């Protein structure tokens, strides 16, 4: 992506949002105030902008462009926001440029999720623009509180649309989003990540339903990474729900699973156990990273690392036998 695509005057302004749903969102300033840039983070950005860190990459160049726009005071926000709502272009630009570092801060939290940092920033900038267009200063909260929600939405939507190879039915996506949004809201109020029981209580839903959807979300997030080569498919693609397939498709899926099981035994014992427990093979029920770690006495991060190593080794085994990843799939 070109450096110039991130300049404010070249950003697209027609991001696709469902405004009917977003208008009903409740923005909690106390819950989101942590997303405002801290002094240390702003100092870090300024050092990057000045090229203090080694290697003047595109991120540093971009930070150099935005690093000298001062943050607005609360009074200035109200002044410029009112003028922006009346169509004053310079005020709108001032609102955007003064909050570009907020986008960078939030975008950094989504690193290693399938998109480069500059791509995340560009998506977040679209959310910032929309926030400026819709911000009502008379409602009494700071602009950064309001903008944070829009920035998150555009970044998360981009990650979902550009990195997922699994497409869920729309009613499942909507239900899952309700649970995830509730989990985020609770995490701001509590001093820990909410459990399935706490989410279920908040929504007055059965705990089993919430647990099932949260497991589904983790499997999609961690398993939908392409296995490699020329294939865009992932391991979860071939472990499909038999209830959604016809008899012929079910037979093909069974053959695929048997092939995977055979190659699993060419991995080392730890890789084989982790993959089997994660994806419901060798008699195990599919489990989350946390559950697998609990069962075998490892941290969640170590389980994830072993999973990545195992999938990489599985690809090497296939290639050594003259097979491609596509050999596991039949349309």
From Swiss-Prot:
One GO CC annotation, please? Answer: cytoplasm
Family statement drawn from the similarity comment of this UniProt entry = Belongs to the sigma-70 factor family. RpoS subfamily.
Q: Where is this region: Sigma-70 factor domain-2?
A: 95-165
Enumerate the residue ranges of region (Sigma-70 factor domain-3).
175-250
| Spans annotated as Sigma-70 factor domain-4 | 263-316
Q: What does this protein do?
A: Sigma factors are initiation factors that promote the attachment of RNA polymerase to specific initiation sites and are then released. This sigma factor is the master transcriptional regulator of the stationary phase and the general stress response. Required for the normal expression of the enterotoxin, yst, in the stationary phase.
Native species? Yersinia enterocolitica
Single biological process term from Gene Ontology: DNA-templated transcription initiation
On subunit structure and binding partners, the annotation says: Interacts with the RNA polymerase core enzyme.
Instruction: Name the gene.
Output: rpoS
Where is it localised? Cytoplasm
| Record-linked PANTHER family | RNA POLYMERASE SIGMA FACTOR RPO (PTHR30603), RNA POLYMERASE SIGMA FACTOR RPOS (PTHR30603:SF67)
Please give the name of this protein. Answer: RNA polymerase sigma factor RpoS
Which GO molecular function annotations are given, in alphabetical order?
DNA binding; sigma factor activity
Region: Disordered; residue ranges are 1-25
What NCBIfam families does the entry give?
PRK05657.1, rpoS_proteo, sigma70-ECF
Regions of biased composition (Acidic residues) lie at: 15-25
**Is Transcription tagged as a keyword?**
yes
The protein's matches in InterPro entries, at most eight in alphabetical order, are given as:
RNA_pol_sigma-70_dom, RNA_pol_sigma70, RNA_pol_sigma70_r1_2, RNA_pol_sigma70_r2, RNA_pol_sigma70_r3, RNA_pol_sigma70_r4, RNA_pol_sigma_r2, RNA_pol_sigma_r3/r4-like
Region (Sigma-70 factor domain-1) residue spans: 57-90
Q: What keywords does the record list, in alphabetical order?
A: Cytoplasm, DNA-binding, Sigma factor, Transcription, Transcription regulation
UniProt motif Interaction with polymerase core subunit RpoC: location? 119-122
Q: Which HAMAP family match?
A: Sigma70_RpoS
Ranges annotated as DNA-binding: 289-308
Which Pfam family name is an example for this entry? Sigma70_r3
């Amino acid at each position: 992506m070109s450096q110039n695509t991130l300049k404010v005057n070249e950003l697209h302004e027609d991001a696709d949002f469902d405004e009917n749903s977003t208008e009903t969102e409740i923005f909690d300033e106390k819950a989101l105030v942590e997303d405002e840039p801290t002094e240390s983070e702003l100092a870090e950005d300024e050092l990057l902008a000045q090229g203090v860190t080694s290697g003047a990459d595109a991120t540093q160049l971009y930070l150099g462009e935005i690093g000298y726009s001062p943050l607005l005071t609360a009074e200035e926000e109200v002044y410029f926001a009112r003028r922006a709502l009346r169509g004053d272009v310079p005020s709108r630009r001032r609102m955007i440029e003064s909050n570009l570092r907020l986008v960078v801060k939030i975008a950094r939290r989504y690193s290693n999720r399938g998109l480069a940092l500059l791509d995340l920033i560009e998506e977040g900038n679209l959310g910032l623009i929309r926030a400026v267009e819709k911000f009502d200063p008379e409602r009494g909260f700071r602009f950064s509180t309001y903008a944070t929600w829009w920035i998150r939405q555009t970044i998360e939507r981009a990650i979902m649309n550009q990195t997922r190879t699994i497409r869920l039915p729309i009613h499942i996506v909507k239900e899952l989003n309700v649970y995830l949004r509730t989990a985020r809201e609770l995490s701001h109020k509590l001093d820990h990540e909410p459990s399935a029981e706490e989410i279920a209580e908040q929504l007055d839903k059965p705990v089993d339903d919430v647990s099932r959807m949260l497991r589904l979300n983790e499997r999609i997030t961690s398993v939908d990474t392409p296995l490699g080569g020329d294939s865009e498919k992932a391991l979860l693609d071939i472990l499909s729900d038999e209830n959604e397939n016809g008899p012929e498709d079910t037979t093909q899926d069974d053959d695929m699973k048997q092939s995977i099981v055979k190659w699993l035994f060419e991995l080392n014992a730890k890789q084989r156990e982790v993959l089997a427990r994660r994806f419901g093979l060798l008699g195990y029920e599919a489990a989350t990273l946390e559950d697998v770690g609990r069962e075998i006495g490892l941290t969640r991060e170590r389980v994830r690392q072993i999973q990545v190593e195992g999938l990489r080794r599985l690809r090497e085994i296939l290639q050594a036998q003259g097979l491609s990843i596509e050999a596991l799939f039949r349309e």
